[in-house]
Amino acid sequence: MQQAWFDVKFKEAAQLRVGKFKTPFSHAYLTTLGETLFPQLPTSLTTAVIMPYTLNAVTPNIGTGFDLGVELHGLVKDKFGYEIGLFNGTGAAVNTASKTMSDDWHIPSLLYAGRFTYMPYGVMPSTQGNPNRLNEKKMLIGVSGSINVESENESTNDTRVGFEWALLYHKWYFAAEAYWMNVGFTKRQKINEHYNYVGGYIQGGYFVAPRVQLAARYDIMNRNSTTKDGLLNMPAVGVNYFFKGCNLKLQAMYQYTGRTGHANQLDRDNDNLGLATHSATVQLQYAF
């Protein structure tokens, strides 16, 4: 089960959501699944980072995605939004509450997350391009953060911070995000070190015809942490066709995974393990 949740609306500024849903982190993730610019999310959000230890149970990525939890959220004056929640911290693959207490911090081993947004022109729709919204003028500026206590099978405490910006202006759509993750090991791992990872992307789309949208993205990440030289840079291009009279969309994209700045060939080879140098995706998607 990927998602199942309900909302209780006390008023516009105070709403309670309970179930399995998207955690409050990243414009890319929080966009409605059928409304994304590309069929694949930015690699810098979804790929597992690399550590200088062989720990099969420790494979975090910067994005937090879907999770079980409870969240208080609301909208103030149609301009200010907030989301504050507690989550299981185990991601989309787990459907039961499985966390206990932190041995190190003596607090519940949960994902503590929050997001705050400012939308100067009114509520930003959850879309990255829609042929029925070609006269919009909306902008979103947001900041989010989280601490996942005893994540990765009780092996690490992970801190994440993100900044996001998005703009819908008539036929144009633009977005940019930057994010940082700090991974610190729990005492039982006997590793007294912290590792920092940063990533980000910029992307844009334009409707060249009423139902045809062109897309471009540049994605970047230091997958092997700031302790080593080297970056992944991942440009992508795409095209979207929206069928008339239904919520059906045909998407196609191509992405290249490049590597630059590594100290040696071994680091360069390791940095894109599990990632295709050239990838193409075609997807027919129904939004509901």
Where do the model's predicted regions map?
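Short, well-ordered amphipathic alpha-helices
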Residues: 112-125, 237-240, 283-285
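Outer membrane beta-barrel
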Residues: 1-92, 108-123, 133-134, 198, ...
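Glycine- and other small-residue-rich loops at beta-strand/loop junctions that grip anionic moieties
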Residues: 61, 105, 193
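Short, contiguous, pocket-lining structural segments
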Residues: 64, 85, 104-108, 153-157, ...
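Outer-membrane beta-barrel pore domains
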Residues: 5-8, 133-288
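Active-site rim elements
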Residues: 57-59, 99-103, 148
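A short secondary-structure junction signal
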Residues: 30, 83-85, 93-101, 126-128, ...
